[in-house]
Amino acid sequence: MSIENSAVSDHSGVNKVVLAYSGGLDTSAIIPWLKETYDNCEIVAFCADVGQGDAELEGLYEKAIASGASECYIVDLKEELVADYIYPTIATGAIYEGTYLLGTSMARPIIAKAQVEVARKVGADAVCHGCTGKGNDQVRFEGCFAALAPDLKVIAPWREWEMVSREDLLDYLAERNIATAASATKIYSRDANAWHISHEGGELEDPWNEPSKGVWTMTVAPEDAPNQPEYVSLELEQGKITKVNGEALSPYKALMVLNEVAGAHGVGRIDITENRLVGMKSRGCYETPGGTVMFAALRAIEELVLDKTSREWREQVGAQMAHLVYDGRWFTPLCESLLGASKPLADLVNGEVVVKLYKGQASVVKKRSPNSLYSEEFATFGADDVYNQKDAEGFIRLYSLSSRIRALHSQK
């Protein structure tokens, strides 16, 4: 069995390629480039609908065909993304470097998996992505391809072609009479899905520059948000939100409702400088309005239902899971093990929370659960009917025994 790198190093033996296609400038240029570079091979465009919005998908099929693709598959992955990737991940408590809710990272495995499925369906011998050679996504996609379809060749044009700028791409398309609505003045690099939108590039490359209001698209500025708070009631079953304000909703639709209501109150903005997998630091501005509310709701119920040791273990799992997801290692035995081990704890996360939305903040102000370990009788500072404070004396003596022995030893 060969374990050689499947990335294409020469331009032979490629007859049909499935391209992860967005309709943007990069992937519009990739289609003719593939045909020219790989001996007029057939190009099948694939677009994953992960909730990036109707505007991003409008006219996509026609655009792909006009650019030279023989077919374009647009696959609806929205519900699957939220139910099978986002919820299992946040159930582990995964949050990268303490702030990033992994919006881009969680979407890459499902996109890669669907791309492989299309490749199998059409009998392709290669897959192609438009990720740059400086970013994390090239590793995420190709790591998934290696795990799911090691026989498929992988083409990464940004690591092959000589074009280095948007102007180069525009000139390339113009020379081939391929129409595009893109311009050379694009300010930000954005990536959107149902969970979040990321913003990079432009003025954001200097961390001394405050993001302008034009950066943000999913949320209003907190200072411009309503002067009155809004309260949202959420019901949870086995770690998933099933109702918003009493209305039963699917995982994806619940997220969409929360995106709208939380975004209107400026909730979910972060501006971070993160450590990329490839070794450099990068600045990113992220908006995750609904996800921020969901994450807070789950953590609030966990506070009620998980004992101390379980919470400590879940925090350790969350830290490791965050790195696995960020680093593109979803389809690995370790990731599968962490997800499976976390499920019994997630199954305890049942109950109801009320979240207060106000000026950029999402605060859980009410919470209850049928699985709650909290007992008002035990926690009260009143009479000792159920908790005899004298019992603490023996516990403290045993708990501090090692410290006592160490101190006595040092006095000898």
Swiss-Prot record:
Annotated pathway? Amino-acid biosynthesis; L-arginine biosynthesis; L-arginine from L-ornithine and carbamoyl phosphate: step 2/3
What's a single GO CC term here?
Answer: cytoplasm
State where ATP binds. A20, Y21, S22, G23, G24, L25, D26, T27, S28, A48, G130
Supply the SUPFAM superfamilies for this chain: Adenine nucleotide alpha hydrolases-like (SSF52402), Argininosuccinate synthetase, C-terminal domain (SSF69864)
Q: Where does the chain bind L-aspartate?
A: T132, N136, D137
Its EC top class is ligase
Query: InterPro entries recorded for this chain?
Result: Arginosuc_syn_C, Arginosuc_syn_N, Arginosuc_synth, Arginosuc_synth_CS, Arginosuc_synth_type_1_subfam, AS_cat/multimer_dom_body, Rossmann-like_a/b/a_fold
In the record, which residues are listed under signal peptide? none
* Main location group: cytoplasm
Q: Superkingdom of this entry's organism? A: Bacteria
| PROSITE patterns (UniProt xref) | ARGININOSUCCIN_SYN_1, ARGININOSUCCIN_SYN_2
Choose any GO biological process term that the UniProt entry carries and state it: urea cycle
Any GO MF annotation of the entry: argininosuccinate synthase activity
Enzyme Commission number(s): 6.3.4.5
Q: Which reaction does it catalyse?
A: L-citrulline + L-aspartate + ATP = 2-(N(omega)-L-arginino)succinate + AMP + diphosphate + H(+)
Query: Which cysteines share a disulfide bond?
Result: none
Q: HAMAP family recorded for this chain?
A: Arg_succ_synth_type1
- State the family named in the UniProt similarity comment for this chain: Belongs to the argininosuccinate synthase family. Type 1 subfamily.
- The molecule here is called Argininosuccinate synthase
Native species = Shewanella pealeana (strain ATCC 700345 / ANG-SQ1)
Instruction: List the gene name.
Output: argG
